[in-house]
């Protein structure tokens, strides 16, 4: 009995561990793992199927093939446990030891481990400071390497070819030692004294000047230090003993017909053993050197293939010509150990079936077929049957269930009651793809799904399948109910809006109910209350659309939950009054007293959730759905061909457009317009014709004229089915109706360009063959795109999840004093996103001051909810500094205050919430809705870009932002600064619009003056860039020599002459060094100064500048001295959609990025080279100036002598995120990425909260470059984790030492994932080999902080409910550590009683650990 107990205990023994360390295995360690040496390549005996002795499957080394039975059969059964059979030498034990016992092979000659050799950068190469080619030549026996130079002129590590070796031998004899093969490399590695080398390199580092050499030394130093601190020895990178995988992990399975299926590893091992044995034999026979050498090389190659096939040379192939799967292939890739088995497991207690509609279900229910339920809940049913005494044994219970006896169904009903099940639909793109429901048993074989959750699952009923999972334990059921129940997931985690909104039929039904019809039966009746209305409708006295008066009683609930009732008479319709029956008390009747479209219903649900909470909303949503279905049925809205009414004006509009096109065609033929202009104009004509037709059609469809009861004509919204469907948002859109009843319009080619002949027909008239062909042309690309899009979007989501997976909320408040500045987002003058949308649910970082006073409106650390946002709007606050995860100071994780509101729950976020994964899902999930294409700007778009004025849309007053200006002779302002902005402020001080205005803009209004809507307030010439005079005086030409640096041109039409400066390249050699300029002099002939400075007013002229003034001409302030023609900017393709989002998150550099000023100072141009200009920026304080070479073809925005600020744009182009971070700081780069990503999603109408993008940006910014190391362990120029550096700095500051300084670095998401602290997480993401090699060499240990690592080692994740478990474990660990520390310094035991007590403690401790 005691044995049995001991045996059972031994089974459940699990090691408690807090981290996983990876390192190099020494030969002794490998031998200690091994249970014996594998000496023969044989596997099993083909006749007896018994494993061969000392072979790859040997039972003596690896354990018995059958449980508790030795190979020869002498000992069987449990009583002989642990006996080793004297005949066959097999230990009698469980057969599962064959999964864990390893063997080994003693190699006759050392072999280099290919990962440390070939995985770049080559660790062996770095260690020995030799090139990879040289090492390979040594290893594969092509040349010798000197190991011990002795007293000769040779050096250690020098390469010798066969000839030079022989020459050296003749010259020096055996003074020196040179070898080839892995032995040589082994000896070189052994000879390295790490400590000495490290000291030496640390000393020489500061004195190294060349950048490349410094980098190389730093790399080598880091590698050596990694080896030194981790206790790995360099020579362990060369294998002397090869471990053999346990046989059950590389199985050999007999198939019928006497053939075998085997794992590729067996072939690879056999190869190694064969060659190793042959090499041993050759060495015993003392064979000639060349043969031994060849055999050693082959051994090296076979070990390479076993470890990583195909890494070097050609992959070894099996009998069927496919490369064999090596050990490395086993762990990497989608089918490897990490992604196939550790991160994605299959689960039991699950089933799947097709889904159908369950319109009668409540929101928290799902219909489960009886057959499935019976199968899934079997264990519970057995338990209940036995507990009830209906079955005596489990076997009897099984029989009952198989026969499906009547009692079984009763028991099933009970078991299933309040036992939630989880439904999942693949692809699970966000957390709403798995939700819990209470099952309701149904007949049939399809799962019934509640229609309102379809949106979250993205499910429809055209054959979709779903999987059911049963949570077994009580805890799992609790979590499913409390966290995953569909009723708890009403708001979307991506944007905080209801995800449970009615769509399609339900919307149509509610819309139909709430419409009004003039002259409806029962119009003008007056009702005392809603129940009378119900009576009137039921008896048919009044129809549903009739306009009536009803007395309504409303309940309003104030903040304290006090209810007050109020009664009023409302003009409404029968249908709306009926809707008020299901309206929960506390909501205003006005919410349903309108046409209920999809938007209105969504708003209604949102209001309900915010005012009344979860429970009421859920009940209300269900009621809305039932009502909607009911009235959709009653309405009988359907689509017939007569509903598509074609407007009569269509034909005249099309004829007009055709006439215009003909006219342009004639102009083109007579040479008045170019081909490009003709194309653009034709497309514009057709586009506007299409607009007109669709407008006429919608007017025709949407309104009908009827005679009301006073006999007067009145217009009312039409009851046309197609119009109702589109107007309510149930199905279709104006664009689709246009194709049905208007004209199809212009079509695109697969490359995105527009075909200039439109399709004038619509679907009701039908298309002819040519029109049909044109339609298919662009449509096919759409289908191909969709397939690619899904894959790309999935990959983006995977990268996002991987970079953000370990970000969890771990504390309440980190105390960060700063945050991001939030302003309303304004583009091209329109407010795209008001301030309230951007700050709702976030925490204030710096007190919000009431505008125009000193009073604090919202104190720091206020969570801005809807009420606060209303207050901010009342006081017209136009910027708020809010806390953000980007500026959060928490070390490993973030704090709740910096994150703000949990969007899916509506209150501040809880501890342990996995915000990283939620953010990744929220960004990735709509990825499939984004487009895949690059937009080519054609037609209207490219011409709009050359705008030349600002026309305001709102009345208000004018404000200028960072603008310098001068007044010209007419008293108008002329802008003389770059990147100036002009804003319109309303009377409350709120910013309504904002525009960028270029240098040289003339303003029609002064600052702070009033403007009216539609007024043009600024003008500029888009095609030339002026040089504006800032003083009045006379023009003096400098270095302007006719025919050398300039030419005179006379305009043929006007006869005016102007001076054109020659480009440097076009000048003669005499003019190359001259710098043409215009100087301004006063009446006395002295230089004038620029106002406020002592800099003379002298303007250098670049090449091609056109000077309109002559020498000595008079000039006024604000006049243009010269104009530089701008080549119209090349139409750049705009990358849109998914590729753009991926580029932003990968932080890729654009092709021709904008050039930004690296420092603030004055611009000048240095000596030019062949294709480049030298730009010099000299700072005002006289410190070091900055030089940059810029290609000539780049269009510069700056001139000689101009002042620029750091980070200002010098040459236009797309800005690179890295530059923005370096020159303008974290806040700007965050703003840039957030806005750019949001632009893409906004185009598709997808709403995502900014927080999610910020979370990803935080992860992209978590590394930094050390600029000076201070007293820390870091090296200068090393990349380190920001949190690590901050922790180290805090400790140093506490000790009064110098902290390290660092520069934040922006990494793309792939790079950032691979650079995480956790090697397990990185290895399971991408580039497994590289990650593991690096980790092993550094002896890294993984602290299992993130989610992925914990899933892989089979623990609860440190998020959600697992967060508490991990917290508890950490607390226990801390107390254990404290105990250990205390035990070390405990005094010696003095009395017997104390000794006894200690012993008792120890025993208790030991007992507690079991």
Curated annotation (Swiss-Prot):
BP GO annotations: DNA-templated transcription
Binding site for Zn(2+) 2: 814, 888, 895, 898
Binding positions (Zn(2+) 1): 70, 72, 85, 88
One matching Pfam family: RNA_pol_Rpb1_5
Matches recorded under SUPFAM superfamilies: beta and beta-prime subunits of DNA dependent RNA-polymerase
Co-factor requirement: Mg(2+); Zn(2+)
GO cellular component, one term: DNA-directed RNA polymerase complex
Enzyme kind, highest EC tier: transferase
CDD domains according to UniProt: RNAP_beta'_C, RNAP_beta'_N
Keyword vocabulary terms for this entry: DNA-directed RNA polymerase, Magnesium, Metal-binding, Nucleotidyltransferase, Transcription, Transferase, Zinc
Entry annotated with the keyword Magnesium: yes
The EC number(s) this enzyme carries: 2.7.7.6
Entry superkingdom: Bacteria
Binding positions (Mg(2+)): 460, 462, 464
Cofactor: binding details: Binds 1 Mg(2+) ion per subunit. Binds 2 Zn(2+) ions per subunit.
Subunit relationships: The RNAP catalytic core consists of 2 alpha, 1 beta, 1 beta' and 1 omega subunit. When a sigma factor is associated with the core the holoenzyme is formed, which can initiate transcription.
Protein name: DNA-directed RNA polymerase subunit beta'
Organism: Shewanella denitrificans (strain OS217 / ATCC BAA-1090 / DSM 15013)
Record lineage: Bacteria, Pseudomonadati, Pseudomonadota, Gammaproteobacteria, Alteromonadales
Protein encoded by which gene: rpoC
